[in-house]
């Protein structure tokens, strides 16, 4: 499952507070972050995402979960898009947004290394 851990002083609550809808076009694919939802314990955010690659559109959520050492961005079990380059790239972009919260943040465990230089 594609994921990226951002270690350091980042929080899902700050991500939610500063969130704005975004759209990128990368290598012909359209990547969108449309909305985000903070749960009542303030430890998890669901980000509504859309990827359009060619004629195929996929709508799904990206889960941000607060951990002791930082935040992990991944696909929740209830959403199951095809793990295309665009889906992986968008999860990496969310990791990049988390990392930008504080200069002390860094990438931790991930299987998205090829996409992290783009975020």
What is each model feature region?
Residues 2-71, 76-119:
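Ser/Thr-rich, low-complexity intrinsically disordered terminal regions
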